[in-house]
Regions:
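Short coil/loop residues immediately preceding or within conserved phosphate-binding loops
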Residues: 50, 112-115
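Intrinsically disordered, low-complexity terminal regulatory regions
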Residues: 1-66
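Short, ordered coil/turn segments that flank beta-strands lining enzyme active or ligand-binding pockets
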Residues: 59, 122-123
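Conserved small/polar residues in nucleotide/adenosyl-binding loops
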Residues: 126-129
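Residue-level recognition of short loop/turn positions
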Residues: 90, 123-124
Length: 129
């Protein structure tokens, strides 16, 4: 079943507070991880107009591109490399206001100027970006 997001323009905090329960409802009855990642990425992109939003999955000890919204992205990222690999290694959110100032930044797109990487960790998987 298709869903329609209902987000009023406001400050980011209000928009997140409105969006989160809608995402929970959207993915609540779906058991397929890939389908849920696809809808979460689409909801974030649609609501906030981010340049790129998406996920990477850990497969064979590297990050492999998963559902995303935005321009073409790097397909594989090594553990501890770039912003995503570093966030995975350190198991923490990393906010990079200027990607040119991040040591070892991987330029998947020259148009990307900043990044926020949030590791999403479950019992058997780590999903990023």
């Amino acid at each position: 079943m298709a869903e329609e997001l209902r987000i009023k323009n406001g400050d980011k905090q209000e928009m997140y507070e409105t969006l989160l329960p809608q995402i929970a409802s959207l993915v609540g009855n779906e058991t397929d991880l890939i389908a849920n990642m696809a809808n979460i990425a689409a909801a974030l992109k649609q609501t906030f107009g981010f340049f790129w939003v998406g996920f990477y999955r850990v497969i064979d000890n590297q990050l492999v591109l998963a559902p995303f919204q935005g321009p073409i992205a790097c397909t594989r990222i090594k553990y501890g490399k770039g912003v995503c690999g570093t966030a995975w290694k350190e198991a923490r959110t990393i906010i990079v206001p200027d990607v040119d100032a991040f040591p070892g930044h991987i330029a998947c797109s020259s148009a990307s100027r900043s990044e926020i990487v949030v590791p999403v960790i479950s019992v058997s998987y780590t999903h990023l970006r």
